[in-house]
């Protein structure tokens, strides 16, 4: 029995890696925040549960397709060379089947147990990431992250739609925050993984325009991000607690970007990349806490 279980466990682990669980977790977290912000009180828990499930399934399906399309590129990069698709230990048919199963299940869950709007928006996000970004933008332009960042910024709108069956201006403000956050987040990664991207032949900004140009644009985007995160307070979507959090977190982001601009090191770029993930989670957490505090007044 144990000899049979080991290969099955290994295959399941390979499938899980292809769905990029860490990235999926952050995306789904932002979607869930959108769900809770969409309701003046406690949202319909069935919509929260099934909305979360459906969005997670389609996100996982998109990431699996991404790994399939980029398997040759991944094989040339140290960071991704151990993926099953890059090593050839899992077939294209298996990945397509996995993605089709996850994506189909996600669409059924969202359509029948949440609402059609959320299903179509999530499907459009799937196409935007798996096809438009991965196939068209990423291998062709250094602005791939900027243009293609919209698909990665959509989770709050998807979550909002799951609860409210609409996507008002407040939801698009959250999308805008992630949209502005995306370039400095990925450019920091591209800086300290620059050799990987050169080997892979991908036109990331540090490859095409150089390190100094990229560092400057990370700094400029960090200021733009700080300004953008003040919008929820400006439109009275949030209160003083969120404002203080946005200023503190944004100030730290600018500080990291300024240090990276003044004196580059791979360690600083890696530190900014990791902080940017924590930054987004804390910022959206502050939005939710501020929302709940407002409900108690």
From Swiss-Prot:
Q: How does it sit in the membrane?
A: Multi-pass membrane protein
User: What Pfam families does the entry give?
Assistant: UbiA (PF01040)
Would you tell me the Gene Ontology cellular component terms? plasma membrane
Give a GO biological-process term.
Answer: heme O biosynthetic process
The EC designation for this entry is 2.5.1.141
Q: Provide the catalytic activity annotation.
A: heme b + (2E,6E)-farnesyl diphosphate + H2O = Fe(II)-heme o + diphosphate
Q: Which domain of life is it from?
A: Bacteria
Subcellular location, record wording: Cell inner membrane
Q: What class of enzyme is it?
A: transferase
Keyword flag Transmembrane helix: yes
What metabolic or biological pathway is this protein involved in? Porphyrin-containing compound metabolism; heme O biosynthesis; heme O from protoheme: step 1/1
Instruction: Report the HAMAP family cross-referenced here.
Output: CyoE_CtaB
Q: Which family does it belong to?
A: Belongs to the UbiA prenyltransferase family. Protoheme IX farnesyltransferase subfamily.
Q: What does this protein do?
A: Converts heme B (protoheme IX) to heme O by substitution of the vinyl group on carbon 2 of heme B porphyrin ring with a hydroxyethyl farnesyl side group.
Additional detail: Carbon 2 of the heme B porphyrin ring is defined according to the Fischer nomenclature.
* Name this polypeptide is given: Protoheme IX farnesyltransferase
The species is: Bordetella pertussis (strain Tohama I / ATCC BAA-589 / NCTC 13251)
Encoded by which gene? ctaB
């Amino acid at each position: 029995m144990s000899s049979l279980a080991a290969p099955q466990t290994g295959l399941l682990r390979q499938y899980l890696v292809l769905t990029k669980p860490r990235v999926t977790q952050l995306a789904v977290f932002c979607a869930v925040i959108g769900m809770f912000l969409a309701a003046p009180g406690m949202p319909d828990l069935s919509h929260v549960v099934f909305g979360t499930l459906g969005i997670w399934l389609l996100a996982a399906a998109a990431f699996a397709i991404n790994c399939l399309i980029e398997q040759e590129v991944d094989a040339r990069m140290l960071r991704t060379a151990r993926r099953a698709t890059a090593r050839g230990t899992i077939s294209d048919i298996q990945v397509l089947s996995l993605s089709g199963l996850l994506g189909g299940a996600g669409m059924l869950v969202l359509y029948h147990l949440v609402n059609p709007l959320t299903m179509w928006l999530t499907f459009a996000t799937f196409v935007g990431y798996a096809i438009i970004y991965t196939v068209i933008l990423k291998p062709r332009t250094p602005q791939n992250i900027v243009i293609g960042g919209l698909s990665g910024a959509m989770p709050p709108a998807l979550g909002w739609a799951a609860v409210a069956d609409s996507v008002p201006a407040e939801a698009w403000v959250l999308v805008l925050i992630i949209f502005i956050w995306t370039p400095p987040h990925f450019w920091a990664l591209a800086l300290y993984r620059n050799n990987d991207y050169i080997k892979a032949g991908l036109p990331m900004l540090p490859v095409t325009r150089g390190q100094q140009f990229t560092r400057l644009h990370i700094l400029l985007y960090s200021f733009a991000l700080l300004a953008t995160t003040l919008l929820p307070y400006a439109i009275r979507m949030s209160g003083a607690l969120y404002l203080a959090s946005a200023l503190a977190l944004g100030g730290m982001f600018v500080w990291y970007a300024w240090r990276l601009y003044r004196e580059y090191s791979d360690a600083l770029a890696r530190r900014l990349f990791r902080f940017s993930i924590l930054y987004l989670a804390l910022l959206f957490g502050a939005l939710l806490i501020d929302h709940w505090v407002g409900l108690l007044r």
